[in-house]
Amino acid sequence: MKILKPAVAGTLESSDCMVTVEPGCGELELDLDSTVIRQYGKQIRRVISETLTRLEVTDARVTVVDKGALDCTIKARVECAVYRSNDIRDALPWGGAIQ
């Protein structure tokens, strides 16, 4: 899925994350800022990467500011930001129903 325009999902509240997606420059670029990066940084990056791969996003700039969100929350925020960037609003395939 191509990122058509900048989009944001989530908040900066505790146990949440804010995900921003923007059109890329030919590659996937991930910028992660997390309050728990030392403990869970690799896992957070893995969840983001797997979600983007499942959505077939290969060219985007993704910025995630994490405040201790669970994996399921991170996944949902990434999905939401990608769908918003494409103005997809109806019949959303949430929770891994894609493919």
Task: Describe these PLM feature segments.
Residues 1-99:
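N-terminal intrinsically disordered, cationic/polar leader segments
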